[in-house]
Amino acid sequence: MEIHLPFRITGTDKPPSAPVTQIRSTLIVSGIQALRTRGFYDQYLALLTPAARTQFTSLITGEWLPVELGLEHYRAADALRLDARVIDAVGGDVATRINSTPLSVAIKLSKRVGVTPWNALSLAHRINDLNWRGGDIGIWKAGAKEALYQWVGQPCASVPYFLTSFSGYLRELSGLFATKAHARPVLEQCTPTTITCRISWI
């Protein structure tokens, strides 16, 4: 496959060793709000450790947190054992919610004639920098309207909930630049620190 966006650190299609270290609180807040909207808030809180429960109930957006707190959030959400369609929808909601942040600048590109998901995928490093520190992303062209998105150094990839919700996140963002988009994790290419998703659109 042709490389569309090389890994930033290596400048090639060879992934680096660069673990994610921090997550923006905006992602966790948005994820909690999406669960609350669906009536899972109390169950979610009950699954958190006491320390995380105290921190998450008073969390504000825009703060940088250790990625371990992101893991705590996704593991608690995973323990809810929600249907995959619900988890995908939660990921889509998170993408929609954070569009009110500087990411909206990229979204405005969708109003320009000729802009496609490929243009948005070219911004993957910059978009990722808004909410994560560390790790790296590489994107390949699997077809005229199909991409393979790989994120390395991401410990949250060890949580099934994250794999599905992040696919929903990518689906929603790609859909802003297309009539309809789909995204799913490629499980055989995922590891405890790597998430690989296939994105397609029409």
Please describe what each predicted stretch is:
Residues 2-9, 13-29, 131-164, 177-202:
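Short terminal or interdomain "cap/linker" segment that borders an active site or interface and mediates
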Residues 59-165, 182, 187:
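Amphipathic interaction/junction segments at domain boundaries or subunit interfaces
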Residues 2-105:
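N-terminal low-complexity or simple alpha-helical regulatory segments
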Residues 167-170:
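Soluble, non-transmembrane catalytic domains of enzymes that act on hydrophobic metabolites at membranes
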